[in-house]
A protein has these predicted regions:
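Carbohydrate-associated surface elements
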Residues: 149, 166-169
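Short amphipathic alpha-helix
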Residues: 18-29, 204-206, 353
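Short, polar loop motifs at secondary-structure junctions
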Residues: 43, 147-152, 221-227, 292-295
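A short, glycine/small-residue-rich beta-strand->loop->alpha-helix junction that serves as a flexible
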Residues: 9-21, 196-200
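Extended catalytic core of nucleotide-activated donor transferases of GT-like folds
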Residues: 9, 23-27, 37-154, 269
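Catalytic binding pocket for nucleotide-activated donors in carbohydrate/polymer assembly enzymes
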Residues: 21-24, 40-41, 229-361, 365
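Well-ordered beta-strand positions
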Residues: 89, 141-142, 162, 257, ...
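Conserved catalytic-core segment of nucleotide-activated headgroup transferases in glycan assembly
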Residues: 171-257, 265
Length: 369
């Protein structure tokens, strides 16, 4: 099958979490023999920021770890949309300009014989609904939503049975436990400051508990304003800046535990969506403690795959327990890995995507018969 995917950027993961899952699932599809072609706009915001901060060397991790993947750029929406001709499946991610989304839809309406899907992995459907409603999706066959609560938003917008839950997942080809265990020390958090969506929570569930539990804290991520960096210094946390996503497994392997601090939209308006770092951390075999969120889809076995706490004091206690109890750490790692391998790999998501495409095509095939 020829698969065309339109993304904000395949090459850059600078403040671009969707690149993590996209690389993993497209790599899986390539491995299965599909002809995968990726297109991104010239001068994408994420790529420009990566190059500004790190130059061409910032791209080396992607090219070294994903030699089977590449992307081509386009300068105008119509030029980009034209690349969909001849495809069997076209997926357009929500972090594309509305002009590109509309142009691909027009191509489909003019006789494009491909299945056309819109892929939403963000909270804008609830945080900025007017923006999302402005996308022209009339000619799209379906929507891929990265959680059931987001899917229900699209159902209310009239998509009915044409919206499908397609969670993110771990790329087990690259995100896996170290082959040999070495000394682990301290707490690590890989994540961006959060645009004001979790600033207080980072202090309550990461910085203060890490300090109070007596654990050194290492932080990786971007978009930390000066006042955020001062806050890190106040609690003795070490800030390292951007980390290429493919380097995350090695960083996890050096640390005793990690923490998940969800953005407020994923604890209030869109519960049940863990975002990709939970999948990746568990796949790497690092014990994880999470700030509260509602796993309403039962993606994990909370309390077995990872610990979840209600407040900062409970987080401090959980981190102390992990630091002092190697059996607890081993139990969490074993359980978390089991759940990822059984349900949440990019291989599972590739299977789900093929099932979705078959389901969307089935009525056409039946009527043609």
């Amino acid at each position: 099958m020829r698969i065309v995917y339109f993304t904000h950027s395949l090459r850059s993961c600078w403040n671009h979490g969707n690149a993590h899952f996209l690389r993993g699932v497209l790599s899986e599809l390539v491995e299965r023999g599909h002809d995968v072609r990726v297109f991104e706009p010239e001068g994408s915001w994420s790529l420009e920021n990566l190059l500004k901060d790190h130059g061409e060397s910032g791209l080396q991790s992607f090219s070294a770890n994903y030699p089977e993947l590449s992307s081509r750029t386009y300068s105008r929406a119509e030029e980009g949309a034209a690349q969909a001709w001849g495809a069997d499946l076209v997926i357009v991610h929500e972090w594309n300009e509305p002009e590109l989304v509309a142009a691909v839809g027009r191509l489909r309406a003019r006789g494009g014989r491909f299945t056309l899907l819109f892929h939403d992995t963000h909270h804008r459907a609830v945080s900025a609904p007017s923006e999302m409603r402005s996308y022209e999706l009339d000619s799209y066959d379906g929507v891929l939503a990265f959680g059931a609560t987001l899917a229900r938003v699209y159902e209310r917008w009239g998509w009915g049975e044409r919206v499908f839950v397609w969670h993110e997942a771990a790329d087990m080809r690259r995100f896996r436990p170290p082959e040999e265990e070495a000394r682990r020390e301290g707490l690590v958090w890989i994540g961006n400051w959060g645009d004001g969506e979790r600033s207080a929570e980072i202090v309550e569930f990461l910085l203060r508990p890490g300090r109070d539990a007596g654990l050194p804290v290492d932080i990786y991520g971007v978009r930390y304003p000066d006042d955020a960096k001062r806050r890190l210094n106040q609690f003795g946390a070490r800030y390292h800046g951007w980390l290429a996503n493919a380097a995350a497994p090695a960083v996890f392997a050096d640390h005793l535990a990690t923490v998940h601090v969800p953005r407020r939209f994923y604890t209030q308006a869109l519960p049940g969506i863990p975002t990709i770092r939970v999948f990746e951390a568990l796949a790497c075999g690092i014990p994880l403690v999470s700030a509260p969120w509602d796993d309403c889809e039962h993606l994990f076995r909370v309390g077995e795959d990872f610990l979840m706490v209600a407040d900062g004091e409970a987080m401090t206690n959980a981190l102390r327990d992990l630091a002092n109890d190697p059996q607890l750490r081993e139990k969490l790692v074993r359980s978390g890995l089991e759940t990822i391998r059984k349900r949440h790999t990019c291989g599972h998501r590739a299977d789900e995507l093929m099932t979705i495409v078959e389901r969307l095509r089935a009525p056409v095939l039946e009527s043609a018969a």
